[in-house]
């Protein structure tokens, strides 16, 4: 009797999981078809295992090649150091 209850519960569980997976897949298929009909020029995201391109297929720029002008002190600061610079720059201004 225990074995039949166990097999019955496993069968019910597998049936529920299968139904949920089928529901998710069918919803996603309908969603993809709607997106393709609304936006026919829509292109998929690019995946680069080397990390040389972004999700839109464009080559990544080096962060050190971009500079921002700090309006507080007037210096040009590298993009990858701008947040740290701004914090120091604003804190030193408040002390005065």
Swiss-Prot record:
Keywords for the protein's UniProt record, in alphabetical order: Activator, Chromatin regulator, Metal-binding, Nucleus, Transcription, Transcription regulation, Zinc, Zinc-finger
Xref: Gene3D superfamilies: 1.10.287.210, Classic Zinc Finger
Subcellular location: Nucleus
Gene Ontology BP terms: chromatin organization; regulation of transcription by RNA polymerase II
InterPro entries, alphabetized: SAGA_su_Sgf11, Sgf11_N
Domain of life: Eukaryota
Mapped zinc finger ranges (SGF11-type): 68-89
Assembly and interaction partners: Component of the 1.8 MDa SAGA transcription coactivator-HAT complex. SAGA is built of 5 distinct domains with specialized functions. Within the SAGA complex, SUS1, SGF11, SGF73 and UBP8 form an additional subcomplex of SAGA called the DUB module (deubiquitination module). Interacts directly with SGF73, SUS1 and UBP8.
Swiss-Prot/TrEMBL domain comment: The long N-terminal helix forms part of the 'assembly lobe' of the SAGA deubiquitination module.
Protein's name in the database: SAGA-associated factor 11
Lineage of source species: Eukaryota, Fungi, Dikarya, Ascomycota, Saccharomycotina
Gene this chain is encoded by: SGF11
